[in-house]
UniProtKB/Swiss-Prot annotation:
Needed co-factor(s): divinyl chlorophyll a; divinyl chlorophyll b
Further details from the record: This low-light-adapted strain contains 8 pcb genes.
Gene name of this polypeptide: pcbE
Organism of this sequence: Prochlorococcus marinus (strain SARG / CCMP1375 / SS120)
Transmembrane parts of this sequence: 27-47, 88-108, 149-169, 210-230, 250-270, 315-335
Main location: membrane
Regulation: induction: This transcript is strongly expressed between 4.5 and 72 umol blue light/m2/s. The whole antenna complex is most highly expressed under low light; as the light levels increase antenna complex levels decrease. Thus at least in this strain the amount of antenna complex is controlled mostly at a post-transcriptional level. Transcription decreases upon iron starvation.
Designated name of the protein: Divinyl chlorophyll a/b light-harvesting protein PcbE
Quaternary organization: The antenna complex consists of divinyl chlorophylls (a and b) and divinyl chlorophyll a/b binding proteins and binds more divinyl chlorophyll b than does the antenna complex from high-light-adapted Prochlorococcus.
Compartments it resides in: Cellular thylakoid membrane
Record SUPFAM superfamilies: Photosystem II antenna protein-like
Annotated family: Belongs to the PsbB/PsbC family. IsiA/Pcb subfamily.
Keyword Cell membrane appears in the UniProt entry: no
Amino acid sequence: MQTYGNPDPTYGWWVGNSVVTNKSSRFIGSHVAHTGLIAFTAGANTLWELARFNPDIPMGHQGMVSIPHLASLGIGFDQAGAWTGQDVAFVGIFHLICSFVYALAGLLHSVIFSEDTQNSSGLFADGRPEHRQAARFKLEWDNPDNQTFILGHHLVFFGVANIWFVEWARVHGIYDPAIEAIRQVNYNLDLTQIWNHQFDFIQIDSLEDVMGGHAFLAFFQIGGGAFHIATKQIGTYTNFKGAGLLSAEAVLSWSLAGIGWMAIIAAFWCATNTTVYPEAWYGETLQLKFGISPYWIDTGNMDGVVTGHTSRAWLSNVHYYLGFFFIQGHLWHAIRAMGFDFRKVTSAVANLDNSRITLSD
């Protein structure tokens, strides 16, 4: 957190990040607990949507978000290929159980375990330094070797998630709106296609290409993760390489930029693409409008739409506005990380009445 040179700063209760800034075990605990909150929300919302689902109304016209995602993954279909909600309750309950496990882990890291992993005794009772694996994940915000080591593990997990998705589509199958049925999809690892889809991914209409992109990302992320785990800073840590800029606030700002950018991309993708977001589950494509800010409106017949808007409209607009505010948070924290003191702004505004300009001869 930005201290503006104060060695002993005091933060308000609303500055939640200050509680975990230099306490790596609590930092992990907050991440795990946050994961539990997400899992609980996903599970509870899935069960709630399943309880109110009306088979006589198109799914996309019922304002649902969790069940359409499961349907796109090929979950909830009977042997005849019709969506009945089969196994959806299991998915929801599984997420709730996972949320309790995550919550317990978050409490353990926050309350029971050492506040800093650097003081952890590790998995072995002898306490030898080489056996204190948890200590390797201590937080040293201005140490690029420490940060690149932690970043590498994040990238590996992202890569594994991509592999899971690709293998799920290949073995189990996912919903293909072109044939309106579940089918197994083999990834198309054509690097030319993957490169070209950087610029027209919103119009992509082939599930094979979608899976190929995820397969490439899996390779790229795991390779990058291994690189970051195994390597250290090359040469002297100079100002050119970010010395003095790398900090907890800087890392927070980059994280906000990443999630904000992904949310905005998801908004545009969901609004127009019917291969990844089938009309059967999300409703008709949207039309982009401009008012005070950009927004999307429904284009189909809204008669009988339960919530007034399709699932696609809810997802696109909510993602866009969340992404927008995440990016504002990125700018705020990035500017603070660069050393700008926003208190000077409020001080300048407060002293406007007392400001005087003297003209000399």
